[in-house]
Amino acid sequence: MNFDMDLFNQVAKSALEYYGWQDKDEAKLIVLSENATYMVKNKETGNNDGVLRIGRPGYHTLSELNSEMKWLKQINEYTPLIVANPMKGLNGEYIQNVKGPDGEVYNCVITEFLKGSSPDENDEEQMVKQFKYLGETTAYLHRQTEIWNGTSKIDRFEWSFDNVIGKTPKWGDWRSFPDMTPEAQTFLEDVVQIIEKRLKRYGKTGNNFGLIHADLRLANLLIEGEQIKVIDFDDCGFGWHLQDLASALSFIESKPIVPKLVNAWLSGYKKILPFTDTDFEEIDTFIMMRRLQLTAWLGSHQQSGPVAELSVGWMEGTMDLAERFKRLFG
């Protein structure tokens, strides 16, 4: 996946005009992933006025983006959670269609800036405490989508097995990871088959499947005191609830602290929603599936800032997880 940074910087500058901010603000790139994300800073005060997200053409339809905005509004109005509110442009719309210098139309949205910092994965005591709040936060999201009559009208992608690590993977093919060996691929193919069989047996019900955030990793959480704020709903879609637990463990799945984090997450989740023995039995399935999904993401996002650092030792950690998974369920 290639990003033309000069092009995206020009689109970001143009996007500010749609909000009437071109004179007082400037956009500075902070993250490259599925989208380009910019901090919108006031030129005089240096304050953060918002966060601009520029989508790659074709990644989301306008209908999908409007559905995301609808869900954010529901979360803010009907749950105790804090999420970043989208801001309307001069035309009264949340989504701005900005024409780039290449002639393509880029969907842009600015959300409010939320204070806070991402969890520090090196502070284990705090991590365990925060995962308890994260479990509770996740359960509020799941409960809201279960009772919201508008959920069925939401137009969002489905994070099915095929769309995650199967025949039509949205983030790319895990087999294309640069350090993948023929031996590792053969072993992981067996693991993928086990995952598919277990998911078919687990099934999709109103209690285990629905509208989810789908990318509740540490980078998309902000901590301020004991309050967890959730950002970046760009990948929200329909999936298994356990995918939100697995995504919270993104890039740290092989660390020794994971069992403590899972237990903390469960203790928070169960305060709001029930969690069955059947759900518990599939936690490892979803963690393994997420790990393979991230393997695909790392392979297909070589331009993203943190990829080089994250890729160090990735295959070793992945194979350790896979071998354990196969011992348990193979």
What role is predicted for each listed range?
Residues 19-41:
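ATP-binding glycine-rich phosphate-binding loop
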Residues 33-51, 86, 196-242:
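Active-site acidic catalytic loop and adjacent metal/ATP-binding pocket
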Residues 102-117:
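Conserved short submotifs of the Hanks-type protein kinase catalytic core
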Residues 294-330:
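ATP/Mg2+ or Mg2+-diphosphate-binding catalytic cores
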Residues 1-26:
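Juxta-kinase regulatory segment immediately upstream of eukaryotic protein kinase catalytic domains
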Residues 241-274, 290-306:
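Active-site activation/catalytic loop segments of kinase-like enzymes and analogous catalytic loops
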Residues 54-103, 122, 126-132:
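A conserved alpha-helical element in kinase catalytic cores
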Residues 90, 121-183, 209:
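A cross-family kinase active-site recognition segment
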